[in-house]
């Protein structure tokens, strides 16, 4: 989380490590106060619990030994466990030494009735990830939940390791095999030791040597080695070499033979490493480089060379904590592994963005029975240094699953982020619940509430500012990844929009295949999606539990005309009836044909991967022709269009045939490029009567002007002229339209923008002749770039739009529209919506007061299948109410066909005023019968879809009216 100060890189909550060159590393265990020197040789594979072979200098054993570092705690060393306390490293649960658990993988939980005030206190083991130790006839077995087993003899000596795949690593006095072909052999001779690892071509030699006549030295060398068929060393080359001096059977000095670094131990005890020096072998000291002393509960580490110095100081008391000049780490008094408190200086942590989008690594989570965190301290920011504080309260909030909550403060220069960490005691952090307290005056805390355990997730913050640099609103997006399969969502993208004291949430949830399965916008409407094993959508649902639209898709394999096909069936609900549409795919899962709810079958035909024809119910409706893979001709219902090309661009569009004499349509559309410096593009549109329109564009594709030439004339007359403001400030101020001159209307429109040219705030209209002003239109916007007011002067006309939550909501739907004429309120319209954002009520009054209501419109929508809450977006009924009258004064009901076309509008209060509509197979209106006015109209179309005839009939006599 953030970049930790480099001075803390070598500080671990458990140990401070100092490299001793190739000789190995010095490990100072902060919880035990023991300092030891070790050199790792190799880790054999073949098990989830690998054999880590190390050379370890042990004063108790009087020298160097090959070490596996497997420790067992004796029964006599274990204090009696009491309810409410943490257990020691190893706990014997039954007193018979039959079952034991390693603390690092398990813990005892003490619950104080977090969920039930009447429950009694109790303690128990939570062993989901435990290591179990069992006594056998020959010794002990250590087994994890995966089935990996380590066997020890009665003295605690490791004998073998068997993994879940049946591979066994056996250990004898001279040979270690891992069951997969890797062999390690070692032998002692003449006070030394030789280790060979054939699988890695490595050989280690630990031999007593004499240096400058001085005894007590050992040489440790590592070689790249090869062996012959008899097992003898064929050749070897040294890669590492170090020398160790023993005095009184204790380690006194370590010398790295390659880097000339020597480490000297004080009082011949490996628990006190006094200094580490640069020197030549056998020569005098050439420069002090590193010292470490341990006295009176304080450790001082000093680093010095010829160019710079650095001092780190550590202090501890009762093994509870380590205090450094860079930070503080404190551990629980009952167990040194349990983090209690930490304060660490970090660089660049959680900087709040300024007009830019940045990623801040924060996280969120959920832990059952959180409890209450109290009495924590907020740190101040000094010199803009961010500080990370952890306050770990182990007693107040630990749930029955062993999860413990810590408070986590992240302070930046603009925000305070409060986070709660959930972790298994003595192990790693697994989740966080986060609050961000904005410094913006009046702002509410940003809150992300988790629902499962999470890994770290970045939070992306975007600050939207107005032209004056003031924050209008902020969005915070967190991406949460579930690596463990705990939830059905592999990825969650959650965005909070914060404005003032309002907060709105939108989200998108993805499954493990990264298919979108759930989403919700700021309007609160939720959408859900389901898929089959092949990733094809099987259903979608939009809306709330009481009002939603649902469509089901079925994708299955069938046989049609002896051919294997796949059918994708869409089932939806209209007018209380189930309707279905189909897409049928061939064996390659390429679209074969579609079938709508009325049974009309549309079939695409391809040749050389190009669409050549579209047929409806076997009749060709559209055909396509190509040259060099470019479309040159399109025929639709008998009307043919042709396309011409210039140098790589579409140059002309025209009709090859004209099927109608009733319409003056464009016959050709030609694009040409001029040779002027700005590369203006000119487009000519010509109709059948010779009328030509000429459009001119600049090199950026912006329309500069429109001219027309009437039939029989030779010159063009200007119709429209546009001018633009060019971009400034490196594009921060974009190019925008400045003026429009409409020569036909004799008017000029001039646009005024805010200083960032984001919005047009004023439109001034003048006469082109004389320049007299006609009117000025003023426009205002809210923080979400929506128009809120339009006025032409307070004495003329104004329109004010209000959105939910007094314009603090990002929703696009209107909540109120107010009209004012000549300074007097003309109307005030309010809107209400259901869970699908469908308009349910429209109230019109003279003011916002309910007493000023003039009339009200109410809307109802069609339900779906019988007995369900499924709903469509089709209006079923519209009712009109007058003020103070409970009965509707107007009631209209709508009916639709299977394609959603309105077929009848019924006047429920006067059935003699109904209106009906009829359509052809292409959903074109062919007849309109209006009994309210006693008229009927019939429409005829050409093959291009143009109305060629409109005839009027008397619906009572069916006679055509002349």
Language-model-derived ranges and their functions:
Residues 20-41:
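N-terminal-proximal low-complexity accessory segments that begin disordered
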Residues 50-57, 65-75, 81-87:
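Solvent-exposed N-terminal domain segments of exported/luminal and surface proteins
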Residues 29, 41, 70-72, 131:
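Ubiquitous "structural anchor" signal
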Residues 1-13:
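Short, intrinsically disordered N-terminal pre-domain segments
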Residues 44, 58-59, 67, 249:
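A membrane-pore/channel beta-structure motif
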Residues 3-6, 18, 39, 53, ...:
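Extended charged/polar low-complexity repeat regions
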Residues 20, 64-68, 192:
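Extracellular secretome segments
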């Amino acid at each position: 989380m953030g970049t930790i100060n480099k001075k803390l890189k070598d500080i671990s909550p458990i140990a401070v490590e100092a490299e001793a060159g190739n000789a190995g590393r010095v490990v100072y265990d902060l919880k035990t106060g023991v300092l030891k020197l070790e050199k790792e040789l190799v880790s054999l594979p073949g098990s989830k619990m690998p054999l880590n072979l190390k050379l370890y200098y042990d004063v108790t054993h009087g020298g160097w030994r090959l070490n596996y570092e497997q420790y067992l705690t004796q029964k006599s060393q274990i204090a009696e466990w009491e309810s409410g306390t943490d257990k020691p490293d190893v706990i014997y649960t039954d007193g018979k030494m039959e079952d034991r658990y390693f603390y690092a993988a398990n813990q005892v939980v003490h619950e104080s009735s977090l969920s039930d005030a009447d429950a009694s206190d109790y303690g128990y083991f939570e062993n989901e990830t435990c290591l179990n130790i069992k006594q056998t006839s020959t010794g002990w077995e250590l087994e994890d939940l995966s089935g990996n087993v380590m066997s020890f003899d009665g003295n605690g000596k490791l004998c073998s390791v068997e993994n879940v795949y049946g591979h066994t690593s056996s250990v004898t006095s001279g040979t270690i095999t891992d069951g997969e072909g890797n062999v390690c052999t070692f032998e002692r001779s003449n006070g030394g030791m030789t280790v060979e690892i054939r699988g890695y071509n490595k050989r280690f030699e630990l031999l007593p040597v004499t240096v400058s006549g001085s005894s007590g030295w050992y040489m440790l060398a590592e070689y790249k080695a090869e062996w012959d068929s008899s097992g003898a060393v064929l050749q070897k080359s040294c890669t590492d070499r170090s020398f160790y001096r023993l005095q009184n059977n204790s380690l006194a000095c370590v010398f790295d033979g390659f880097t000339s670094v020597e480490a000297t131990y004080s009082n011949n005890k490996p628990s006190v490493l006094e200094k580490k020096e640069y020197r030549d072998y056998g020569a005098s000291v050439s420069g002090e480089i590193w010292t470490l002393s341990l006295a009176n509960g304080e450790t001082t580490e000093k680093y010095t060379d010829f160019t710079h110095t650095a001092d780190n100081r550590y202090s501890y008391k009762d093994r509870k904590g380590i205090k450094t000049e860079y930070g503080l780490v404190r551990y629980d008094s009952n167990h040194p592994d349990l983090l209690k408190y930490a304060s660490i200086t970090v660089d660049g942590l959680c900087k709040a963005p300024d007009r830019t989008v940045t990623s801040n690594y924060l996280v969120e989570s959920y832990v059952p029975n959180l409890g209450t965190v109290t009495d924590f301290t907020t740190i101040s920011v000094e010199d803009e240094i961010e500080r990370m504080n952890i306050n770990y309260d182990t007693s107040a909030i630990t749930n029955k699953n062993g999860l413990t909550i810590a408070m986590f403060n992240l302070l930046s220069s603009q925000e305070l982020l409060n986070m709660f960490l959930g972790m298994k005691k003595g192990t790693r952090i697994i989740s966080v619940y986060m609050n961000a307290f904005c410094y913006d005056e009046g702002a509410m805390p940003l809150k992300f509430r988790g629902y499962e355990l999470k890994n770290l997730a970045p939070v992306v913050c975007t600050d939207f500012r107005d032209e004056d640099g003031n924050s209008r609103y902020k969005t915070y997006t967190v991406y949460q990844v579930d690596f463990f399969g705990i939830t059905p969502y592999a990825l969650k993208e959650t965005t909070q929009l914060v404005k003032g004291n309002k907060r709105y949430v939108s989200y998108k949830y993805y499954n493990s295949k990264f298919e979108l399965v759930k989403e919700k916008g700021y309007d609160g409407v939720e959408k859900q999606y389901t898929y089959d094993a092949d990733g094809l959508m099987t259903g979608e649902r939009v809306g709330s539990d009481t009002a939603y639209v649902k469509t089901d898709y079925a994708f299955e394999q069938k046989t049609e005309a002896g051919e294997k096909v796949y059918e994708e069936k869409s089932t939806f609900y209209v007018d209380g009836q189930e309707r279905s549409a189909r897409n049928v795919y061939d064996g390659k899962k390429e679209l074969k044909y579609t079938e709508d709810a009325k049974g009309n079958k549309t079939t695409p035909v391809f040749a050389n991967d190009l669409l050549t024809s579209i047929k409806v119910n076997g009749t060709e409706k559209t055909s396509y022709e190509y040259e060099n893979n470019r479309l040159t001709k399109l025929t639709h219902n008998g009307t043919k269009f042709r396309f011409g090309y210039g140098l790589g661009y579409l140059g002309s569009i025209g009709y090859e045939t004209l099927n109608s004499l009733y319409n003056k349509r464009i016959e050709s559309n030609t694009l040409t490029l001029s040779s002027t410096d700005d590369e203006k593009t000119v487009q000519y549109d010509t109709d059948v009567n010779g009328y030509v329109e000429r459009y001119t564009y600049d090199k950026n594709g912006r329309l500069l002007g429109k001219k027309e030439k009437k039939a029989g004339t030779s010159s063009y007359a200007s119709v429209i002229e546009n001018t633009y403001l060019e971009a400034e400030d490196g594009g921060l101020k974009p190019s925008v339209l400045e003026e429009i001159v409409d020569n036909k209307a004799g008017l000029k429109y001039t646009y005024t923008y805010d200083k960032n040219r984001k919005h047009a705030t004023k439109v001034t209209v003048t006469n082109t002749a004389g320049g007299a002003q006609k009117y000025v239109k003023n426009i205002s916007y809210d923080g979400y770039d929506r128009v809120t007011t339009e006025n032409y002067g307070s004495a003329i006309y104004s329109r004010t739009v209000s959105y939910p939550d007094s314009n603090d909501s990002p929703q696009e739907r209107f909540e109120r529209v107010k009209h004012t004429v000549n300074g007097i309120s003309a109307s005030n319209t309010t809107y209400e919506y259901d869970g699908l954002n469908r308009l349910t009520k429209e109230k019109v009054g003279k003011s916002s007061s309910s007493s000023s209501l003039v009339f009200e419109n109410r809307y109802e929508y069609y339900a779906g299948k019988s007995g369900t809450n499924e709903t469509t977006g089709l209006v079923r009924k519209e009712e009109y109410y007058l003020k103070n009258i409970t009965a509707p004064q107007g009631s209209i009901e709508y009916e639709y066909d299977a394609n959603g076309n309105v077929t009848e509008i019924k006047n429920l209060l006067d059935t003699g005023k109904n209106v009906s509509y009829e359509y052809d197979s292409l959903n074109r209106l062919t007849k309109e019968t209006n009994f309210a006015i006693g008229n009927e109209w019939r429409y005829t179309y050409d093959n291009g879809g143009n109305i060629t005839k409109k005839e009027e009939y008397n619906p009572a006599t069916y006679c055509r009216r002349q």
